[in-house]
Amino acid sequence: MRTPEILLTADKTVMINYRLTCLGGFVACVPRKSLPVPFAKLMEKRLFLPAPTNENGEAELANLFLRKVETTLLESGFDVVVCDSAYLDKFNAKVYGISTIDPFGIGPATSTMVGLSGGKEPFNKFYFEELIRKIRRERPDSIIMVGGPGVWQFDVLDGKQEELGIDCIVEGEVEEIAQDLVKKALE
């Protein structure tokens, strides 16, 4: 098991493999229990595939947010790995940086679909919370930082950061503060 200082990842709806359709990102907005179970399972199996990885479990493809943070931290001399959340068990990091787009399903597209379904939980909320809980359960002493365009949702849903055990929410251009933030987290 590799032990990098920092592991960067995202839930499977953010790291979605667009091999089958360019509209795959919209599937993350669909309420999970609004679909017939066999269709939902097939869709999850075919669309929410792990990102292509190398033999070490490191993601070969990742979103721009993760790659910008990775580059900033590598240039500062940190040991950083970007991996798909399906391969977390290959690593034991001190700091986990999570990128998110719509963590609680209240973005425009998702909230519309959730409203039409009568309020059922969307895939993006389910997988984001599952990822955070898994890291917290399996690596209780690690630091969890969350950033990305969806962090505004923590301001709207007061208490979610504490409920999920997230240590730090990063809003804004993280490249400017990443080095100092991570240095403090590692101390």
Task: Please give the residue ranges for each predicted region.
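N-terminal [4Fe-4S]-dependent radical SAM core
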Residues: R2, R19, E58, D180-E187
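Detector for Asparagine
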Residues: N17, N54-N56, N63, N92, ...
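Short N-terminal binding/cap micro-motifs at the start of the first secondary-structure element
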Residues: V14-C22
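Short, charged N-terminal beta->alpha structural module
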Residues: R46-S76
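Iron-sulfur (Fe-S) cluster-binding modules
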Residues: M1-E5, K45-L47
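Short, hydrophobic/glycine-enriched beta-strand segments
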Residues: T3-V14
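A solvent-exposed, charged loop/short amphipathic helix patch at secondary-structure junctions
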Residues: C22-N56, P103-Y127
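Glycine-rich beta-alpha loop elements in corrinoid/cobalamin-binding modules
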Residues: F65, S76-E187
